[in-house]
């Protein structure tokens, strides 16, 4: 038996420090099974087929010290019926054979995951640590190259840049697509997705205008240009952030119902009207709209059953107005609903209009009469507490000047 080689005495600390090349790792008793670094003879981190009666010496196992009072008497460790799998399986029933002065202790069954195994092996066996360091990493391109990254520009910024760099300050939709793909390689893939977003940005932003082709410029598709009143939407030529969102005031004021028609004629009429020179199409559409309104008014005048409300509906309207007036009066006079003779009701506190000036005195006397505490409480504080208990709001009995300002007549006559 080589139990003497594993004995950890306090005065032999220098010998142990020379034996271990790295600083010692201290763990607790509960985590003792996870702090055992197992040396293997043939494999990287596996402990296979050891006898249950054989004791493990310092040559076959690197032990981590336990910073409890058992270091002077620990002699060795023997494995129980457990085995440790390759990369961190469960260590079960690890029993330690201690000296006769201490009772044998069985380690708690636990599981060593891969991270714990790596940290323990690196802390106690420098052989495995160095072999782990010397491993070369596979040279893979984990990140896309910078030139193929997505540009930090919005679709409105891309369209504005494309139009502004054009000599004629006008581009077709296909030319905008081509300019974006030539400048940014990111947009050479997933073309259907971002081109759909470009079309939406052109249609739903007032800063872009659709210009029809002139006869001297034959071709396919209309031109897109920037609105002349949009100005500098981007601060100091920086296209990363828009300074303001342009809204066409004329388009917002007109509110044409056929604006969302979807055909090219309505888009042209809206863009031309936004420029200030309205096309004949827009004039005719506005004239038709006015004629339809006049026809509708005439039909309503001819049919009295549509204009004059029925007696039932008129009665319902009057009832709703009456309910609203009653609700407003109830909001102003919350004491109107309390018809019972309560000690703190308005009827008892102010029996006549001549006693308005005595309200504070009567309130104080009644509160002190009903409180029964005898403490020098103020009338307003006791009043609030008693009114809260009785179910009344304390705000229903404020100063008399409030009611005199709200009502033109005294309160007693108004109820």
Swiss-Prot record:
One of its GO terms (biological process) is cell differentiation. Residues 150-244 bind DNA. Residues 310-323 have a biased composition (Polar residues). The keyword tRNA-binding does not apply. Keywords: Activator, DNA-binding, Nucleus, Transcription, Transcription regulation. Residues 266-277 have a biased composition (Low complexity). Residues 251-324 are annotated as: Disordered. It is found in: Nucleus. Residues 251-262 have a biased composition (Basic and acidic residues). PROSITE patterns: FORK_HEAD_1, FORK_HEAD_2, FORK_HEAD_3. The keyword Transcription applies. SUPFAM superfamilies: Winged helix' DNA-binding domain. GO terms for molecular function: DNA-binding transcription factor activity, RNA polymerase II-specific; protein domain specific binding; RNA polymerase II cis-regulatory region sequence-specific DNA binding. InterPro entries: Fork-head_N, Fork_head_dom, Forkhead_box_C, FOX_domain-containing, TF_fork_head_CS_1, TF_fork_head_CS_2, WH-like_DNA-bd_sf, WH_DNA-bd_sf. GO terms for cellular component: nucleus. Transcription activator for a number of liver genes. Interacts with the cis-acting regulatory regions of these genes. This is Hepatocyte nuclear factor 3-beta. It comes from Oryzias latipes (Japanese rice fish). The gene is foxa2.
């Amino acid at each position: 038996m080589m139990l003497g080689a594993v004995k950890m005495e306090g005065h032999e600390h220098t010998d142990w420090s020379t034996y271990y090349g790295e600083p010692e790792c201290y763990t607790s008793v509960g985590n003792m099974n996870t702090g055992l670094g197992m040396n293997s003879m043939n494999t990287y981190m596996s402990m296979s087929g050891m006898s249950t009666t054989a004791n493990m010496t310092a040559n076959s196992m690197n032990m981590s010290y336990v910073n409890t009072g058992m270091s002077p008497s620990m002699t060795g460790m023997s494995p129980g019926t457990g085995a440790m799998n390759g990369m961190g399986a469960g260590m079960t029933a690890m029993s330690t054979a201690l000296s006769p002065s201490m009772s044998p202790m069985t380690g708690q069954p636990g599981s060593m995951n891969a991270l714990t195994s790596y940290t323990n092996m690196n802390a106690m066996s420098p052989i495995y640590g160095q072999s782990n360091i010397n491993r070369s990493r596979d040279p893979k391109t984990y990140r896309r190259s910078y030139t193929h990254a997505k540009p930090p520009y919005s679709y409105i910024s891309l369209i504005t840049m494309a139009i502004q760099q054009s000599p004629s300050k006008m581009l077709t939709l296909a030319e905008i697509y081509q300019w974006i793909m030539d400048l940014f390689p990111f947009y050479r893939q997933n073309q259907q997705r971002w081109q759909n977003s470009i079309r939406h940005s052109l249609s739903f932003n007032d800063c872009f205008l659709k210009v029809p082709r002139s006869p001297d410029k034959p071709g396919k598709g209309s031109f897109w240009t920037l609105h002349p009143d949009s100005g500098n939407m981007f601060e100091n030529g920086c296209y990363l952030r828009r300074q303001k969102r342009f809204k066409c005031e004329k388009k917002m004021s007109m509110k044409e119902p056929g604006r969302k028609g979807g055909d090219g004629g309505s888009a042209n009429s809206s863009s031309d009207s936004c420029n200030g020179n309205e096309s004949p199409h827009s004039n005719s559409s506005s004239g038709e709209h006015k004629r339809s309104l006049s026809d509708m008014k005439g039909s309503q005048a001819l049919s009295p059953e549509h204009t004059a409300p029925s007696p039932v509906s008129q009665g319902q309207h009057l009832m709703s107005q009456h309910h609203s007036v009653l609700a407003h009066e109830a909001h102003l006079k919350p004491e109107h609903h309390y018809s019972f003779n309560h000690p703190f009701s308005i009827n008892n506190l102010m029996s006549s209009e001549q006693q308005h000036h005595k309200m504070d005195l009567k309130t104080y006397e009644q509160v002190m009469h009903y409180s029964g505490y005898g403490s020098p409480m103020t009338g307003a504080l006791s009043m609030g507490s008693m009114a809260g208990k009785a179910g009344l709001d304390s705000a229903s009995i404020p100063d008399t000047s409030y009611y005199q300002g709200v009502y033109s007549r005294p309160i007693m006559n108004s109820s």
